[in-house]
Curated annotation (Swiss-Prot):
<dbReference type="Pfam" id="PF16661">
    <property type="entry name" value="Lactamase_B_6"/>
</dbReference>
<dbReference type="InterPro" id="IPR048660">
    <property type="entry name" value="IntS9-like_C"/>
</dbReference>
<dbReference type="InterPro" id="IPR027074">
    <property type="entry name" value="Integrator_9su"/>
</dbReference>
<dbReference type="Pfam" id="PF10996">
    <property type="entry name" value="Beta-Casp"/>
</dbReference>
<protein>
    <recommendedName>
        <fullName>Integrator complex subunit 9 homolog</fullName>
    </recommendedName>
</protein>
<dbReference type="GO" id="GO:0032039">
    <property type="term" value="C:integrator complex"/>
</dbReference>
<dbReference type="GO" id="GO:0034472">
    <property type="term" value="P:snRNA 3'-end processing"/>
</dbReference>
<dbReference type="GO" id="GO:0005634">
    <property type="term" value="C:nucleus"/>
</dbReference>
<dbReference type="GO" id="GO:0160240">
    <property type="term" value="P:RNA polymerase II transcription initiation surveillance"/>
</dbReference>
<dbReference type="GO" id="GO:0160232">
    <property type="term" value="C:INTAC complex"/>
</dbReference>
<comment type="similarity">
    <text>Belongs to the metallo-beta-lactamase superfamily. RNA-metabolizing metallo-beta-lactamase-like family. INTS9 subfamily.</text>
</comment>
<comment type="subunit">
    <text>Component of the Integrator complex. The core complex associates with protein phosphatase 2A subunits, to form the Integrator-PP2A (INTAC) complex.</text>
</comment>
<dbReference type="GO" id="GO:0005737">
    <property type="term" value="C:cytoplasm"/>
</dbReference>
<keyword id="KW-0539">Nucleus</keyword>
<dbReference type="InterPro" id="IPR001279">
    <property type="entry name" value="Metallo-B-lactamas"/>
</dbReference>
<keyword id="KW-0963">Cytoplasm</keyword>
<dbReference type="InterPro" id="IPR036866">
    <property type="entry name" value="RibonucZ/Hydroxyglut_hydro"/>
</dbReference>
Amino acid sequence: MKLYCVGHSVSSPCLVLQFKQTNIMLDCGLDMSTVNQFTPLSLVNNEKFSQLKSWSSRELQEIEGFTAQNNLKEAGGRLFIDAEPEVCPPETGLIDFSMVDVILISNYHHMLALPFITEYSGFNGKIYATEPTIQIGRDLMLELVTFAERVPKRRNGNMWKNDNVIRCLPAPLNELANVKSWRVLYSKHDVKACISKIQAVSYSEKLDLCGILQLSAHSSGFCLGSSNWMLESEYEKISYLSPSSSFTTHPLPLNQTVLKNSDVLIITGVTEAPIDNPDAMLGEFCTHLASTLRAGGNVLVPCYPSGVLYDLFECLYTYLDNAKLGMVPIYFISPVADSSLAYSNIYGEWLCQSKQTKVYLPEPPFPHAELLKEARLKVFSNLHNGFSSSFKTPCVVFTGHPSLRYGDAVHFMEIWGKSGNNTVIFTEPDFPYLEALAPYQPLAMKTCYCPIDPRLNFAQANKLLKELQPRHLVMPESYSRPPVIHPHRTDLTIEDPGCSLTTFNHLDVAALPISRSFEKVVIANELSSCLHPQHVRPGVAVATLTGTLVTKDNKYTLQPLEFLVEPKAGSEGGDSSTNKGQLSRHLWGTVQLDDFVRSLKKRGITDVNVESSGGEHTIHLPNDDAMILLDRGSTHIITHGNEELRIRIRDALLECVPQF
């Protein structure tokens, strides 16, 4: 078993697990930390950003073509790239994504790179996710694409990606890595095509993968529809512990029972804010919000259009009334705002028990339905469709994007940033708030960092791992050492789990200590009826048997031996025959590739393409839509149900293998 780490950061995981001739992708996270290096996409021709001076140096001017393609701008004492922000999808050079059999998505935050794979990599396998994950993930993608497309950015070349240019830049730009793999966002068409390929699953639903593994999703408690995935064969159990939560919020609680006693447990998604308690941060959020409103200022909350947002609305529903601020308007601005709020109210079976009860009464499970009914919460898709006519201050505005590089949050930063009465409150932990604010400096408005991250912290994760008792633990290497900003906090690590441990980093290929010890074999009825068990001691009976082991669709069947049938002397047909004895053939040695190709051509299979790598051979038969995989220990024939073709290939193979 091997694990390939093709994701670029711990917070945006993308892993490929190779097990029993299958390739399983676990999550498809998109690294968006790269957008911090770009100037914001402003809705209007902003004076500050439009008048930024280009930056250069003597070394850069000597590089041919740089001056004509100089995208570097200086703002707030540091450099930014003045172009459409680019993101970093999973690494494509480590493994061929067209060979991936299935993609398992754990939550809607970890599927944002999916269009890059489904539309541009040759992938044609299956994708599984829960219904809320599919719909809310679609909303997140469409919001991002809308933000990017409505503010077209003039492209002035990619000279800034040149290695010689990067070496001449000041920090942090000179520390950038993998810039050649950065890409602009996909299109709305890509999103729709991608979403159409995802198959919805329910919790605990059993999915068959090539007859080898049973896949099932189980609640992780992190967000609506979030899942931990279980991969089970007859004798192995592999668990993927994705971002999970033990806090009692709106999703179904974490189902940890199914994760116990795994042969391999892969853990990702421990909190990005390890020293910040979500309940305490929620209290700080409300306190800062109320103090700003009482002073006549406005509050901007850069956020995603789902997730913690629902909990913030629920908190403000009662808090503003108790603070005698019930008449302060709350605005939720997003291209997918209506869709997000609507879905939150109809996914009753994915909610915690208390909210499920409300759905069946029937009552709205979330209080934001009451806020909408009372016109205290007002929803807009953008700033120019009726927003200005209902806009009143002081107010609270929830809008995207948390990075402050896309969306309507950029506009509010521009118009409110000059006043010290206003406050921007960061609740999403995915983007360092100082990085997000950097291009807006100097800034008069107050800033508050209240990261509300319900994911497991290290103490909770360590407690959970002791209860789950896996035989082998796999985790990012960064979990084994304290965070960079808290180097002395040794408690902010995954402790010795009491089992074997494998850690990984970006682009690592980890060999996991699990091998195929047993396989289930079914004995054919014809063979089992011939068995004559002999009792050797009470409760134990044994019998010898001889048969032919048949492998098809990764299922093993023991069939009766074939008989060598010859016509009787003097007979013209094969109707009358005598049993000359059982056919006994023992194969040994290796297949000679040239002999095998000749044997195929002798049987009419002439269109043969061979690819060889490290002792392994892949033989493509384009005309027959088939493929043969040969390696040192096994042979696989893939004919998509063409039994006649499979038999011809088998006979050609047997002709080339020594036997006695």
